[in-house]
Amino acid sequence: MQRPLLEQPERLEQRLKDIPTEPGCYLMRDADDRLLYVGKSKTLRSRVRSYFRSSHDLSPRIRLMVRQICEIEFIVTDSEAEALALESNLIKNQQPHFNVLLKDDKKYPYLCITWSEDYPRIFITRRRRFRSPLDRFYGPYVDVGLLRRTLFLVKRVFPLRQRPRPLYPNRTCLNYSIGRCPGVCQEKVSSEDYHQILRKVAMVFQGRSDELRQLLNQQMERYAERLDFESAARIRDQLQGIDQLTADQKMSLPDASVSRDVLAVAQDDHFAAIQLFQMRAGKLVGRLGFAADATDLQAGLILQRVIEEHYSQVDAVEIPPEVLVQHELPQQRLIAEWLSEQRERKVQVLHPQRRQKADLIDLVMRNAEFELGRARQSQEQQALANEDLAQLLELATPPRRIEGYDISHIQGSDAVASQVVFIDGLPAKQHYRRYKIQSSSIQAGHSDDFMAMAEIMRRRFRKWARVKAEGADLDQVRRQSSSSLNMDGLHDWPDVVMIDGGKGQLSAVMEALRELDLHEDLVVCSLAKQREEIFLPEAKQPLESEPDQLGVSLLRRLRDEAHRFAVTFHRQQRGQRMKRSRLSDIPGLGPKRVRDLLAHFQSIDAIQLASVDQLHQAPGVGLSLAKQIRAYFHPQEMDEDNMAMAGEDMA
């Protein structure tokens, strides 16, 4: 394993000399070759060298990063503007840990269109995860109610697929009959034509309603000229629907031709709330919200990072000719050049002083301050809950990392466990873990929650048992864990472990921890479901507490999240087993071919709907086997084929 460059002065100096003085991007990696940070500069060598001159001028976050740098790479570009575009793409595609400014704030929803699919789906989601580079997220939207109403009306105005999967294997459903769906499930509409419909829908969520009206008006006139009055009437209905869609956009500007985005930020020492108002043709068509880590960052830099991240993920037509910002950006001219290049037309980035534009900034800033106030209130509640939990469990300091565990199964079958983690009172989903119960004594028809929970504790903490056996100071490990939890996640020692269950589950867990010699090092409790009672090891009675206490509420949220996560995983395992067992009934399909089929088609529904030719294209499936699989799911087709062959023989 490589050592950090800071520990190798000669190698560091040589590496810095190798970096050119031209514009470009630099990439910093750690000992495991993980990308820590991507940056850009007009002069690469000077910029990279600045990280290693003096740590006093660096923020705590960047100082932590510099201590981990083991390798530095660079990519030379022709200009600083080109470096900015490259940096934006690298950050978007690789998400380096120390570049991620915007928080994954689940309260803001997005609209997703899966352009990568032959018949794209359109849905609301709070998880911004790209399954394909072609898929697009629109948002994040502040008002989820308005977003739902808009999507509901869009599905009334335009014929769109209404279901993620077909309702019937070989015929359309009622939605097709009443004109709500173009018959996607039976391919009544071509993929190209359906994409054309979706492109019109996307214009609504891009704030291009006026442009869409012009397009539809032209189509309606063409249909009328051809005397195709039925199609013209359908377009007329769509135009009326678009008028209804934009009825909620009441805020407007005096100049109806103006299109601009307006950004403002409100921040404290640790957190920033950013608002982006989208004005198109003089109307407010979208309000997007972002949350950011504001530690040691100037407001102008936060706004610049938001602009870089947001506009790197939108289509060129969504970039307006004017972007107003509350504060001067560190590289405002460069950002304007980059946006102009993206849009292929001039874009101005302005820090306005005159009244009308400054009033717009003030309006957006007030909304940002409101969001910051809500975030502070939430943080205060979380801090109070942690303090109350510390008092309940008699801890010296409020816990930062707490872990919750639960078991899920049906009479021992498909037994699984969940580990969920809250950090500073909030779910930290990157630290969640799922376990399949491995004990041979827990199987269908025989369950043992105590044994299952003990197994999970052994698997979770056996590495820490080895650390302790090697003579490590676990008190020091705890301190390191608390100081770096939110920075790099390197340490995963919990301040509190909570078990879903009563005294029995807690006793089994403590016995397992005693085997690991960690029973005195971990703070463990259990939360029983019926009376929300909290049990501690060795205590005969539950803790005295009130159900509405903040600390109890925190444990209850942790317990409910562990239960949800365990049940979801159990259902997945059970569903996969049932799929495998159903396919295993088909002659010629062994376990490997079943796995290959499911990997190729993704679901048993897709296998059931596949034609013989499509099945034949799957790995390891010959023509004869493809016919057998098709016949298994559609025996009536086989009967019809046999009857046809019999008729030919008689003839």
Curated annotation (Swiss-Prot):
- Residues in GIY-YIG domain copies: 21-100
Q: Which GO terms describe its cellular component?
A: cytoplasm; excinuclease repair complex
Q: Which GO terms describe its biological process?
A: nucleotide-excision repair; SOS response
One annotated GO molecular function: excinuclease ABC activity
Q: Which Pfam families does this entry report, sorted A to Z?
A: GIY-YIG, HHH_5, UVR, UvrC_RNaseH, UvrC_RNaseH_dom
Where would you say this protein principally sits, based on its record?
Answer: cytoplasm
Q: Known SUPFAM superfamilies for this protein? A: C-terminal UvrC-binding domain of UvrB (SSF46600), GIY-YIG endonuclease (SSF82771), RuvA domain 2-like (SSF47781)
The alphabetized UniProt keywords are:
Cytoplasm, DNA damage, DNA excision, DNA repair, Excision nuclease, SOS response
Protein localization: Cytoplasm
Q: Which InterPro entries match?
A: GIY-YIG_endonuc, GIY-YIG_endonuc_sf, GIY-YIG_UvrC_Cho, Hlx-hairpin-Hlx_DNA-bd_motif, RuvA_2-like, UVR_dom, UVR_dom_sf, UvrABC_protein_C
Query: Ranges for the UVR domain?
Result: 210-245
For whether the record's keyword set contains Cytoplasm, the answer is: yes
Entry keyword annotation includes Cytoplasm: yes
Subunit note: Interacts with UvrB in an incision complex.
Role summary: The UvrABC repair system catalyzes the recognition and processing of DNA lesions. UvrC both incises the 5' and 3' sides of the lesion. The N-terminal half is responsible for the 3' incision and the C-terminal half is responsible for the 5' incision.
Which protein family is it in?
Answer: Belongs to the UvrC family.
**Which HAMAP family does this one have?**
UvrC
Q: What is this protein called in UniProt?
A: UvrABC system protein C
Q: Which organism is it from?
A: Synechococcus sp. (strain CC9311)
Q: Lineage of this protein's species?
A: Bacteria, Bacillati, Cyanobacteriota, Cyanophyceae, Synechococcales
Q: Which gene encodes it?
A: uvrC
